[in-house]
Structures are given as structure tokens and as C-alpha cells.
UniProtKB/Swiss-Prot annotation:
HAMAP family: Glu_tRNA_reductase. The active site is at C50 (nucleophile). This is Glutamyl-tRNA reductase. Its EC number is 1.2.1.70. NCBIfam families: hemA (TIGR01035). During catalysis, the active site Cys acts as a nucleophile attacking the alpha-carbonyl group of tRNA-bound glutamate with the formation of a thioester intermediate between enzyme and glutamate, and the concomitant release of tRNA(Glu). The thioester intermediate is finally reduced by direct hydride transfer from NADPH, to form the product GSA. The gene is hemA.
Length: 411
């Protein structure tokens, strides 16, 4: 049955309108959400992340009230969108334009996985399949045609960028990563991705954690006691630790006796000041400056990204209307074929009674098929024109009449 684009509805709760802890509390409740949607949707997809909880649906009666009830007190922060506003919002989400950090990439995978989960649960049909596949396509197009995802706006990524530029790349270099926590892990992974031939040494208070990370990046693991020896052989040092006093002393750096690149994103700093002249040093302020520069590039790309989104929103509208027209035509053809089959069977029966041979009967059947198609051709052309003009509601009325008539004939 064709569904009008105007029926498309979404209940939106995001970081832009609600406190993060409120939004994040629904991230683990996707299963509950699908449970309460039973009976109030024909199709649905739940998109839940730490920054957003969104329910997209082709609704039945009571959908909005059910979702609002599920949100409870958080419902005062929710927005309800319909039709093209739903399409535009989802496409902007997939493009990274609605993210807390403009252009972040993770959301694109989250949108794709949300649809796959809905499909696995049997609640995402062909219409939301079309919507979400086009949303993912839009997100990819925006990222390939603009610099909306330029650079890395996380401190670890920015630190690696600074170190790369200062050292002239990492290939063939000895990179020491001090700290095996989340930030250290990101930095070590980025270095390995960029430089297959780099030697990576992981230094951490807990050698077991250092070994765990080293195993992931094809590196070596050491305790803090090995720092002086490792610094003497290092080309680049990346630091991300939580300490009360510096773990890299000025004397250690002076003993190196040659050029060394050190980037420290620890707060407070983990490298003792002042820095010797043989060391290129970048701290958290330098890293934050890089992040601001990256964000400035991304922000300049927003108008281009928005233009692509609008192009794809218009395309989705055409695809949706065409799908509706195809379904309406299929309804009409089902009715026409049923009537034709009945009439042909009656004609064949009569002709047999008149002694008409088998070849003539085949001709009669072929003629009936051809006549049916020719008679319906103007209606089919009208259906496609109506879809392009957005007149799907009238077409649906026509299809419904054929559907009702077919049901009557079957009974």
C-alpha cells in the first residue's frame, strides 16, 4: 500500500535541546522502545546514541502519544517532525551537521546500524529502508565532496598531527607513547595507521596495560623506569597521563643531546618545564589551537554540505513518490489481471464449446493481455506524472478503489 511522505513522523530528543545525561539515559533502552512501538507503527527505526534519541516511523494512531509517554519527563525537550522535515533532519544527522562536533564520522555508522537493527527486528520496511539508505548515501556524499570531516578534533588526533608535522612523518621513526589509557591508545593507533614501519614503544605505570596496547599496535611495552633509556633513542614522544608531577624530567631531555619532538596533552603537563633547546615541545594549548583551526575549516564547509543535503532531500522526495506510484500501479494491475483472467477463462470456455482449435485459443488469450496493457497505459502514465507532481494522495484514492473492487470480487 502506498504511503504518503507527509505521514512520515519522527520524535526527536537531542543534545541541542536537552541535558546530555537526560538524552544519554535512553541509549541503553532501544529494546524497550521497540517493545512499546508494537501496534502503533507500520515501520519504525530507533536511533539512539549518547547525543540523541530519535524514533522515525510510518505511524498508526497513538504513535506520538506512546513515544511521549515512554520519554516521561524528558518529553518536554522533545520535538515532533513530519514529512520533509523528517527527511531533512535525518540527512543532516547523517552528514554530521547536527553533531556536537561538526562533521564527526561516527554518526554515519550509527545511522546505518540503527536501520539494520530495525530490519533485524522486522519493523523497518521498504519505505524507511529507502529513507535510511539515502541518508547514509547523503552522509557519504557530503564527506567525499566537502571537507566537513577534515582533520581530527580530538586532542589525541590533534597531538599526532602536530607531532607528524614537526617530525616530518613517522615512517622509520621511533615513537614513544607515554600512557596506555584512552588518549594514549588513540595516539598509538593513529601512528601505526600512518606509519607501518615506525617503531612504537608504549610506556605505562602498569606494564600489563602497556603490553595490552602494544599488542594492538605491534609495539613494545615498558614500565616508567625505562623512560630515560627510551627517550635517548626516540624521535617522537607523545604523552597522555594523569599525574601530580612531571614524569619526564628536564634532565632526561637534556641527556638526549639531539633533536626530539615531544607533544604532551596531559593536564597538568607531564613534562617538566622549561624545555631544553634541543626539544620541539607542544602542550595542551598548542593542541587546542590546532583543534580550533580544524573546526574553522569544517565550519567553512557547512554551506557546501547543506547544499548537498538539500539536493538529496529533493531526490528522496522523487524516489518516495515514484515508489508510491509503482505500488499504486501494482494495485491497479492486480485488479486488471484478475478481471482479465476471469473474462479470458469464460471466453476460452465458450470458444471450446464452439469447436475453436487450441491455436485460436492462445491467440485470444494473448489478445486479452495486450488489450489490457493498452487500456491501462494512459492510467500508468498519469500515475507517474502524478508522482512527479506530488499528487500521490489522489493516486492512492484511485488505487484504493481498485483494491476494494478486487477484494469484493475475491469474495
Amino acid at each position: 500500500m502506498p504511503r504518503l511522505l507527509e505521514e512520515l513522523t519522527a520524535v526527536i530528543l537531542t543534545h541541542r535541546d536537552a541535558p546530555l545525561d537526560v538524552v544519554g539515559s535512553f541509549e541503553s533502552r532501544v529494546g524497550e522502545a521497540y517493545q512499546i512501538l508494537r501496534g502503533v507503527v507500520d515501520e519504525a527505526v530507533v536511533l539512539a546514541t549518547c547525543n540523541r534519541f530519535e524514533v522515525y516511523a510510518l505511524p498508526r494512531r497513538g504513535f506520538v502519544e506512546t513515544v511521549i509517554g515512554f520519554l516521561g519527563e524528558a518529553s518536554r525537550y522533545a520535538r515532533i517532525l513530519h514529512g520533509m522535515d523528517v527527511v531533512r533532519h535525518l540527512f543532516r544527522v547523517a552528514a554530521g551537521l547536527e553533531s556536537a562536533i561538526i562533521g564527526e564520522n561516527e554518526i554515519l555508522g550509527q545511522v546505518a546500524r540503527a536501520y539494520e537493527e530495525a530490519r533485524r527486528r522486522g519493523v523497518a520496511g521498504k519505505y524507511l529502508g529507502l529513507l535510511f539508505s539515502q541518508a547514509v548515501r547523503t552522509g557519504k556524499l557530503v564527506r567525499s565532496r566537502t571537507r566537513i570531516s577534515y582533520g581530527n578534533v580530538g586532542a589525541p588526533g590533534a597531538a599526532v598531527k602536530l607531532a607528524r608535522e614537526a617530525a616530518g612523518g613517522f615512517d622509520g621513526k621511533h615513537v614513544v607513547v607515554v600512557g596506555a589509557g584512552e588518549a594514549g591508545s588513540i595516539m598509538a593507533s593513529l601512528v601505526r595507521e600512518e606509519a607501518p614501519t615506525a617503531r612504537i614503544s608504549i610506556v605505562n605505570r602498569s606494564v600489563d596495560r602497556a603490553r595490552e596496547l602494544a599488542g594492538k599496535v605491534r609495539g613494545e611495552a615498558y614500565g616508567l623506569d625505562m623512560l630515560p633509556k627510551l627517550l635517548a633513542a626516540a624521535d617522537v614522544v607523545l604523552v597522555a597521563v594523569t599525574v601530580n608531577e612531571p614524569v619526564i624530567k628536564r634532565s632526561m631531555l637534556e641527556d638526549v643531546g639531539r633533536h626530539l619532538v615531544v607533544v604532551d596533552i596531559s593536564n597538568p603537563p607531564a613534562v617538566e618545564q622549561p624545555i631544553p633547546s634541543n626539544v620541539y615541545y607542544a602542550g595542551l594549548r598548542d593542541v587546542e589551537k590546532v583543534i580550533k583551526e580544524v573546526l574553522a575549516v569544517r565550519i567553512r564547509e557547512v554551506p557546501k554540505a547543506e547544499a548537498i543535503v538539500e539536493e538529496q532531500v529533493a531526490l528522496l522526495r522523487k524516489l518516495w513518490l515514484k515508489r508510491g506510484a509503482d505500488e499504486a500501479i501494482a494495485e491497479i494491475m492486480r485488479y486488471a489481471n484478475r478481471v482479465m483472467e476471469e473474462e479470458v477463462e469464460e471466453l476460452v470456455s465458450r470458444l471450446r464449446g464452439l469447436g475453436v482449435d487450441g491455436a485460436a485459443l492462445l491467440v485470444a488469450r494473448s489478445f486479452a493481455y495486450s488489450l489490457t496493457k493498452k487500456l491501462l497505459r494512459p492510467l500508468i502514465l498519469y500515475a507517474h506524472e502524478a508522482a512527479l507532481e506530488g499528487s500521490l494522495s489522489k493516486l492512492e484514492e484511485i488505487a484504493q478503489k481498485y483494491r476494494d473492487e478486487l477484494a469484493r470480487r475475491q469474495h
